[in-house]
C-alpha cells in the first residue's frame, strides 16, 4: 500500500519492490492492485510492462490521486471490492505489503485466486532477526518494514515465511515462486531469519 499524495505532489517514485513484482507480470497482462494507494504500482506496471491496470482503494485522497494520474480505480474496501468482479477477470491480483493488515486472510486469498490466474503478495517477514531480537527484549518490533507502534498499528496478522507457506498448503494455493529481500539484496541463505520482505507468486492448487 503506497503513501497518499498531496494535491501538489509529483507522482511517487517507484518503490524498489515494484521492479520485482513487474518481473513476474507478463507484458500486456490485466492486473488488479488491492489497496493501491495513489496508484504508483499500477502506473509502473503500465509503463514498464504494458499492463492494463486497475486499483481498489478506499481512501478519498488516494482515489483522487489515482484519477489525477490516469490510473483506473474503484473506491471500495479491498476485502469486499473483489466481490464485484467475475471469476477469471484478471491475469494477476496484487496485494503489496498489505496482507498483514487484512482481517480475513483466508477469504482474500480465495477471492484473489477466483478472479485471477495468479496472485502476487508481499509482506514484512515477522521472523526477521531484528524483529526477533526486539520481541526477545520485551518489545513489539518497529522497523522500516513495520513502522508502527503497537498501539497504532494497522497490522493485525503478522506472519513469517513459514507461516504463509503453511497457510497456502492448507488453503489450496500453490506457490509458483518466492523472493525474499533485505533492502535491495535478495536473501537465499536462511531467508526466514535474514529476510525483511517476502514476495510470493501463487495459483490455485490443481
Give the location of each predicted region:
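Class I SAM-dependent methyltransferase "Motif I" SAM/SAH-binding loop
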Residues: 35-37
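Conserved alpha-helix/loop element of class I SAM-dependent methyltransferases that forms part
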Residues: 12-28
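Class I SAM-dependent methyltransferase Rossmann-like catalytic core
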Residues: 2-14
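A short SAM/SAH-binding and catalytic strip from SAM-dependent methyltransferases
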Residues: 92-103
Amino acid at each position: 500500500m503506497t503513501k497518499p499524495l498531496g494535491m501538489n505532489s509529483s507522482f511517487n517514485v517507484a518503490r524498489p519492490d515494484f521492479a520485482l513484482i513487474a518481473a513476474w507480470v507478463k507484458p500486456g497482462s490485466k492486473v488488479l492492485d488491492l489497496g493501491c494507494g495513489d496508484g504508483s504500482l499500477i502506473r509502473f506496471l503500465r509503463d514498464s510492462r504494458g499492463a492494463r491496470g486497475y486499483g481498489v482503494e478506499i481512501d478519498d485522497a488516494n482515489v483522487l490521486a489515482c484519477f489525477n494520474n490516469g490510473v483506473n480505480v474503484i473506491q471500495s474496501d479491498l476485502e469486499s471490492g473483489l466481490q464485484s468482479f467475475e471469476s477469471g477477470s484478471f491475469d494477476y491480483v496484487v496485494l503489496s505489503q498489505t496482507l498483514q493488515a487484512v482481517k480475513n486472510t483466508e477469504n482474500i486469498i480465495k477471492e484473489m485466486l477466483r478472479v485471477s490466474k495468479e496472485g502476487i503478495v508481499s509482506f514484512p517477514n515477522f521472523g526477521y532477526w531484528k524483529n526477533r531480537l526486539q520481541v526477545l527484549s520485551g518489545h513489539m518490533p518497529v522497523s522500516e518494514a513495520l513502522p508502527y507502534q503497537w498501539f497504532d498499528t494497522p497490522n493485525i496478522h503478522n506472519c513469517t515465511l513459514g507461516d504463509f507457506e503453511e497457510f497456502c498448503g492448507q488453503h489450496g494455493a500453490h506457490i509458483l515462486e518466492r523472493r525474499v529481500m533485505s533492502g535491495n539484496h535478495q536473501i537465499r541463505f536462511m531467508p526466514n531469519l535474514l529476510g525483511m520482505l517476502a514476495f510470493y507468486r501463487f495459483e490455485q492448487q490443481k
